[in-house]
């Protein structure tokens, strides 16, 4: 049979080879679309993976944790508990504050959740206390998310109450209006108010009760509609001096008349302009300040949002008096930008390394140019798809593109190497391009779809990990797909136009030396392959040994969740004695801040004490430590944390808990440490028994450090035990007693002053400047219906007891959280196993439910799905290869290369001291797609040699190994060098990228050494097996 002319070949590439103008313009269109998409893409640290989270805050000044739980938190929880799509509800009820955090399923829209939350709050309104001064408010942000920017506002001349007023009316509202801002909170705010400090002795002398004062003030300060009327010719609106606005006017307010003389408020109380809440304070580097924490809206472009705020700051500063300064303390986007810049540099470095590898192997500038064009074209074209899919430029998508650098060039290398082989044999460039491209087309398709098949399981991963890596997988898949298109269109077209025999035959000293070197390497490989094929069972034993070793290494390697990043910001919690006073806590906070500011790596510190949505009690203070840029410090964040904790340990009466701020936040509450473990039961008393016991046992474990719990039942409680019979005889009711105590000690908000721009409160309290301990309680006097004054001591006894500082719930049941960090030298998996073992040994009661929270819970879920994820990737690739080859056997041969990659990756992780975390797992899955390329290129040529040239399986696979050795080595080196920049990352966020690079380099080195020998042996083994299965069983007569 006469062989057809090559001009009739070309397969899917034929049209593009013969139409160079159309091919060029198509590539230009891809390039332009990618550039436009890149300019429009948002920039972020990680893909948008936030759970829809809403925080509901209710303030009830003066209420104890028990009162907050029963009267505020429980009614709201009951309504929230019936909402669909609710994943978890946690609450914290402390003195004067109830904070409920609602975390919804990832599939639920935040806007839908917001509507449900508002409806639930409305439904609970009638069940809440009637004197609740503030209705429940909600925010569509995760309280555990660190702010994207932190501002400090200080003043050298103005009181903080005036500064607060300006912030609320001028600054906070303007920043809240910036696109992308989700919430602006003021920490340490000193809202102005009129404080009425009652004199118990003066009240008693006039025969007055605190309730009569409260009633008089409430009645005297009103702001209600008064109507209007029409006269004969005009309409008149009514107004009156029904409001009291100044402190002097309040002093002159008449409470009652005694002996025909007025009793004014100043006669029984001190009235002054003062902060609404005197137990809130914040500092910036030890200077009293109001801290503005700015949190982003879910899904917002964090870089654009921060830029808008920065552009707005000069205008805001100009609107303030000169004595008021706005200082930028922290900007999360600084490290995000630096991290993205580092990855972009590593991407460019990877491209340069890959191009260098291509030149070393092809040894021709023109031949190097052709596959080198495929790299930027494939990567830039991917940006267009990323834009239409709603992705962002972040660490993971840039990591995907960096790894793709080694992938996208592979196809072009395979094509150009095959075409160049025919040109070197003397064929015309056009004929060689048509013949070479047509011959290799199926291989390119096999390589592309089998590699994309590996990524398919990543798309179906559930929960937050699936969301996190979806952008990674799709970005990588799109770049691989575009590279295949480029390799089947542009690459052969350029080969036909640019390559010729003279250019390829041109040699210099470098090309001749490198040619001799490659010839020697191929000859050495051929001799080694001959020996290996003559001893197949030894090689097969090695292959089986790698599989066994992979399983063993997976069992023993430490397992983690997500690498701890150094983003230059540390969150801190200062914990003091449960009975500490506010003023003493201020002193402790200053001591800790002083010690931190002395550290040379610290740039600034903001601190806060008081009860708000993130801080549950007065005995804990919050810190945000901003480190100097990487260029100004040589130490990583964990080293700095260890040193700061050692310095704080010298301060008596406090414990300092520190953790680095992370890009990925799964938790729903601000914690002292990175990881949490909760106990949940019906009984608070049972928690009080077992939480301290378990905490004490966990503190003994070497795998853990910074172990603590939020169980605090040592608060000082003054229990007023009323003799009800005696009180009734004297005409005193429990309502009067509660009201008198609330008026005296609750910072009770009794009235509101309305202005054109803001509202201010009138606060009632008892003035007891020189009293200590429980003495102020002995000054309480009550007035019965006949006007008689009844001392509280005559109807009640005061007992000092212990009580809880906060009551925590998870899904409406009492709970307590044990926080911990992983000790150096251990992984999160070690810590989880140690906790589970300790829990089992202690034999907790069956009605106590234990559960890991946040990152640890996600780690457990990821750990159980890891094996299935790898299995799913292998099965998906087997199915694709089986369909492409129409064979059950050949896919098994190709997949036999995988254990070698697993061994190399796991050994590299162990040698480098890294744990097997989610990033490393992704690296192993990518290796599954890469290392099988070697087998595909060998088997494709072997099958073609058997089918078209009638070679024996031995001759076919032997020739395929030698012919494909150089492209196999070239593609592997390209993939390996694309991962080298990630492996040696040192900049911001390097902890996130390094495990991927380590896995890729270790797996590729090991697989490259072994698969060149194991694949042909297994190919021949399965070929013999297939022949035996196909050979018919001989008949009895034939046997004889």
UniProtKB/Swiss-Prot annotation:
The keyword Transport applies. It comes from the Bacteria. The chain crosses the membrane at residues 16-36, 342-362, 373-393, 396-416, 440-460, 472-492, 537-557, 865-885, 888-908, 911-931, 968-988, 1002-1022. Disulfide bonds: none annotated. Keywords: Cell inner membrane, Cell membrane, Membrane, Transmembrane, Transmembrane helix, Transport. It is a multi-pass membrane protein. One of its GO terms (molecular function) is xenobiotic transmembrane transporter activity. Part of a tripartite efflux system composed of MdtA, MdtB and MdtC. MdtB forms a heteromultimer with MdtC. Belongs to the resistance-nodulation-cell division (RND) (TC 2.A.6) family. MdtB subfamily. This is Multidrug resistance protein MdtB. It comes from Musicola paradisiaca (strain Ech703). The gene is mdtB.
């Amino acid at each position: 049979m006469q062989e057809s002319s090559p001009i009739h070949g070309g397969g899917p590439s034929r049209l593009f080879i013969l139409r160079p103008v159309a091919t060029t313009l198509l590539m230009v269109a891809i390039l332009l679309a990618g550039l436009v998409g890149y300019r429009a893409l948002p920039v972020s640290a990680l893909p948008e993976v936030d759970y829809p989270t809403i925080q509901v805050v209710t303030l009830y000044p003066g209420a104890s944790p028990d009162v907050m739980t029963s009267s505020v938190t429980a009614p709201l929880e009951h309504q929230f508990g019936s909402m669909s799509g609710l994943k978890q509800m946690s609450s914290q009820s402390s003195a004067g504050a109830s904070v409920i955090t609602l975390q919804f399923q990832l599939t639920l829209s935040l806007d839908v959740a917001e509507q449900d939350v508002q409806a639930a709050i409305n439904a609970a309104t009638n069940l809440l206390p009637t004197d609740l001064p503030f209705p429940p408010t909600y925010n569509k942000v995760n309280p555990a998310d660190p702010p994207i920017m932190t501002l400090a506002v200080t003043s050298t001349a103005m009181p903080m109450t005036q500064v607060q007023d300006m912030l609320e009316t001028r600054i906070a509202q303007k920043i809240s209006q910036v696109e992308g801002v989700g919430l602006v909170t003021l920490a340490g705010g000193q809202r102005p108010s009129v404080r009425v400090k009652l004199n118990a002795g003066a009240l008693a002398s006039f025969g007055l009760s605190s309730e009569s004062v409260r009633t008089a003030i409430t009645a005297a300060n009103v702001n209600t509609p008064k109507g209007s009327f029409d006269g004969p010719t005009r309409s008149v609106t009514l107004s009156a001096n029904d409001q009291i606005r100044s402190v002097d006017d309040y002093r002159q307010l008449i409470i009652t008349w005694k002996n025909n003389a007025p009793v004014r408020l100043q006669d029984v109380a001190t009235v002054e302009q003062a902060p609404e809440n005197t137990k809130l304070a914040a500092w910036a580097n030890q200077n009293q300040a109001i801290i503005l924490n700015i949190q982003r809206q879910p899904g917002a472009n964090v870089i654009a949002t921060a830029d808008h705020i920065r552009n707005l700051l000069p205008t805001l500063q100009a609107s303030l008096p000169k004595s008021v300064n706005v200082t930028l303390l922290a900007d999360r986007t600084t490290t995000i930008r630096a991290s993205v810049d580092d990855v972009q540099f590593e991407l460019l470095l990877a491209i340069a390394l890959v191009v260098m590898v291509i030149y070393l192997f092809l040894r021709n500038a023109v031949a190097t140019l052709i596959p080198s064009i495929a790299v930027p074209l494939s990567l830039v074209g991917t940006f267009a798809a990323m834009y239409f899919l709603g992705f962002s430029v972040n660490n993971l998508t840039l990591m995907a593109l960096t790894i793709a650098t080694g992938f996208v060039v592979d196809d072009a290398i395979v094509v150009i190497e095959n075409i160049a082989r025919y040109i070197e044999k003397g064929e015309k460039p056009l004929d060689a391009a048509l013949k070479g491209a047509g011959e290799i087309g199926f291989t390119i398709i096999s390589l592309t779809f089998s590699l994309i098949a590996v990524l398919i399981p990543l798309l179906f991963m559930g929960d937050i990990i699936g969301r996190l890596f979806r952008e990674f997988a799709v970005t990588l898949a799109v770049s691989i797909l575009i590279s295949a298109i480029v390799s089947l269109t542009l690459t052969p077209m350029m080969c036909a136009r640019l390559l010729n025999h003279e250019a390829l035959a041109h040699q210099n000293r470098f090309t001749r030396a490198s040619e001799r070197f490659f010839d020697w390497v191929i000859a050495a490989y051929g001799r080694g392959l001959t020996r290996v094929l003559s001893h197949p069972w030894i090689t097969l034993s090695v292959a089986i040994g790698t599989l066994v070793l992979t399983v063993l290494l997976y069992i023993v390697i430490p397992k983690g969740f997500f690498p701890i990043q150094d983003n230059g910001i540390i969150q801190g919690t200062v914990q003091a004695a449960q009975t500490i006073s506010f003023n003493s806590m201020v002193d402790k906070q200053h001591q800790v801040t002083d010690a931190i500011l002395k550290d040379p790596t610290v740039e600034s510190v903001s601190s806060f004490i008081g009860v708000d949505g993130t801080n549950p009690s007065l005995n804990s203070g919050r810190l945000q430590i901003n480190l100097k840029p990487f260029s100004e410090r040589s130490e990583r964040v964990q080293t700095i944390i260890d040193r700061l904790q050692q310095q704080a340990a010298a301060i008596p009466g406090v414990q300092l808990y520190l953790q680095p701020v992370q890009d990925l936040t799964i938790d729903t509450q601000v914690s002292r440490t990175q990881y949490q473990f909760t106990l949940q039961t019906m009984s608070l008393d049972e928690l009080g028994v077992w939480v301290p016991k378990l905490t004490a046992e966990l503190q003994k474990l070497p795998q853990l450090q910074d172990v603590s719990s939020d169980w605090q039942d040592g608060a000082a409680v003054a229990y007023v035990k009323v003799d009800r019979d005696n009180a009734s005889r004297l005409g005193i009711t429990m309502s009067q007693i509660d009201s008198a105590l609330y008026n005296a000690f609750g910072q009770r908000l009794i009235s509101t002053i309305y202005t054109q721009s803001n509202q201010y409160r009138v606060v009632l309290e008892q003035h007891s400047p020189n009293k200590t301990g429980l003495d102020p309680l002995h000054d309480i006097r009550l007035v019965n219906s006949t006007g008689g004054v009844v001392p509280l001591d005559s109807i009640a006894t005061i007992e000092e007891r212990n009580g809880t500082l906060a009551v925590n719930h998870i899904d409406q049941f009492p709970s307590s959280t044990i926080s911990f960090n992983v000790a150096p030298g251990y992984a999160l998996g070690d810590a989880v196993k140690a906790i589970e073992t300790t829990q089992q040994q202690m034999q907790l009661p069956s009605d106590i439910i234990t559960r890991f929270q946040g990152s640890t819970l996600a780690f457990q879920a990821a750990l159980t799905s890891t094996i299935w994820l790898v299995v799913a990737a292998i099965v998906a690739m087997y199915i694709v290869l089986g369909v492409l080859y129409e064979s059950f056997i050949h896919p098994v041969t190709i997949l036999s290369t995988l254990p070698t990659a697993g061994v190399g990756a796991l050994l590299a992780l162990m040698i480098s001291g890294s744990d097997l975390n989610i990033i490393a797992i992704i690296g192993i899955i990518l290796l599954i797609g890469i290392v099988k390329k070697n087998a595909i290129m060998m088997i494709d040529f072997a099958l073609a040699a058997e089918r078209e040239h009638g070679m024996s399986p031995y001759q076919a696979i032997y020739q395929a190994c030698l012919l494909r050795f150089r492209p196999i080595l070239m593609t592997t080196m390209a993939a390996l060098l694309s991962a080298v920049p990630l492996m040696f990352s040192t900049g911001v966020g390097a902890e996130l990228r390094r495990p991927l690079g380590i896995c890729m380099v270790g797996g590729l080195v090991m697989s490259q050494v072994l698969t060149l020998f194991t694949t042909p042996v297994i190919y021949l083994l399965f070929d013999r097996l297939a022949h035996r299965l196909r050979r018919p069983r001989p008949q009895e007569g034939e046997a004889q």
